[in-house]
Amino acid sequence: MNKQVYMDYSATTYTKPEVLEEMLPFFTENFGNPSSLYSFSDKTKKAVNLARERVSKALNAEKNEIFFTSGGSEADNWAIKGIAYANKKKGNHIITTKIEHHAILHTAQFLEKEGFKVTYLPVDEEGFVSVEDIKNAITDETILVSVMFANNEIGTIEPIKEIGELCKEKNIYFHTDAVQAIGHVDIDVKDMNIDLLSMSAHKFYGPKGVGALYIKNGVKIQNLIHGGGQERGKRASTENTAGIVGLGKAIELAMENMPEENEKLSNLRGRLIRGIEARIPEVKLNGPKDMSRRLPNNVNFSFIGIEGETLLLDLDMNGIFGSTGSACASASLDPSHVLLSIGLPHETAHGSLRLSLGAKNTEEDIDYVLEVLPKIIKQRREMSPLWEDYMKNKEEK
């Protein structure tokens, strides 16, 4: 059996043993409904409150501003639809970017069919949105700006504080999808003037199927899910106690480990980028060149003359697991909307590989990838008419 190297931590992470350990009693012993009044539910009630406290501490938010959801997609949907419907008397215009996660883009497209107007702002070749562009897009009808904290494909960390200041000045709600940022970037919702923020536990070593939405006190938002009075009447459904406990523990660990973890990941990322650039000709690093403005675990390359899907299968056969884009879209054969938005031609975007690093990756893993990947690229290019055409054109120039 080949060595196995998982490098798709931006798609999902494993649940850390300490997190699982804290969750387990809530499946078997402490199974009471947290909304019940009797004492049997006291432990579950306390556990949910502790998780809320841990999340609020991580964001510098108030405890009553944290609402648990089934994940990042629900949190994004709630933020966008909830603000749109609750504030439509004030205006019907939303501003976002072309490189958002599909949970934002598809929600925005849904709202367009409902009569809302949406501006999808372009980004530069490194994936940054311009604060000036946001300013120029604002109209009297604008009720919400939604910009992701960090991009899941190319690792770009957006100028969130500046956008928050602009939105505060213009009296417009500001939402950020921070699903990729938790555990990698310092987040302070007060200092950054963030009104709404989405997160998902499985991106920071917590369980799948649980997330949270931070909603600043005073924000006018409509419910997405109707039913019982859970989450202070804002989000119906019996609380997923074990999941919520896991999210709380995972975010606490993520905050504690962040400085050390980021340094480790940055070093591994540097080794991987330098190694690929030194060993493989005609490659393009996608995303920010200034590594301080990029997620410490993100590497995204385009290889001229290569099909991304074929590359993934070749790597898989060698025990290396990466991605050609976000996992939510990798079943589709269309090139990544993010890579097209940063100006890559169709065929270059098609030949992209994202390697996202995480807690279990080592220098040995990096060296193994650097041993295997160049051989695969060389072999595939020898069979590729795209590569042949590219080299011919290059020689003619």
From Swiss-Prot:
The keyword Transferase applies. The active site is at 328 (cysteine persulfide intermediate). GO terms for molecular function: 2 iron, 2 sulfur cluster binding; cysteine desulfurase activity; metal ion binding; pyridoxal phosphate binding. One of its GO terms (biological process) is amino acid metabolic process. Its main location: cytoplasm. It is found in: Cytoplasm. GO terms for cellular component: L-cysteine desulfurase complex. It catalyses: (sulfur carrier)-H + L-cysteine = (sulfur carrier)-SH + L-alanine. Its EC number is 2.8.1.7. The modification N6-(pyridoxal phosphate)lysine is found at residue 203. Its cofactor is pyridoxal 5'-phosphate. Pathway: Cofactor biosynthesis; iron-sulfur cluster biosynthesis. [2Fe-2S] cluster binds at residue 328. PROSITE patterns: AA_TRANSFER_CLASS_5. Disulfide bonds: none annotated. SUPFAM superfamilies: PLP-dependent transferases. Pyridoxal 5'-phosphate binds at residues 72-73, 152, 180, 200-202, 238. HAMAP family: Cys_desulf_IscS. NCBIfam families: FeS_nifS, PRK02948.1. Homodimer. Forms a heterotetramer with IscU, interacts with other sulfur acceptors. Master enzyme that delivers sulfur to a number of partners involved in Fe-S cluster assembly, tRNA modification or cofactor biosynthesis. Catalyzes the removal of elemental sulfur atoms from cysteine to produce alanine. Functions as a sulfur delivery protein for Fe-S cluster synthesis onto IscU, an Fe-S scaffold assembly protein, as well as other S acceptor proteins. PANTHER family: CYSTEINE DESULFURASE, CYSTEINE DESULFURYLASE FAMILY MEMBER. Belongs to the class-V pyridoxal-phosphate-dependent aminotransferase family. NifS/IscS subfamily. This is Cysteine desulfurase IscS. It comes from Clostridium botulinum (strain Hall / ATCC 3502 / NCTC 13319 / Type A). The gene is iscS.
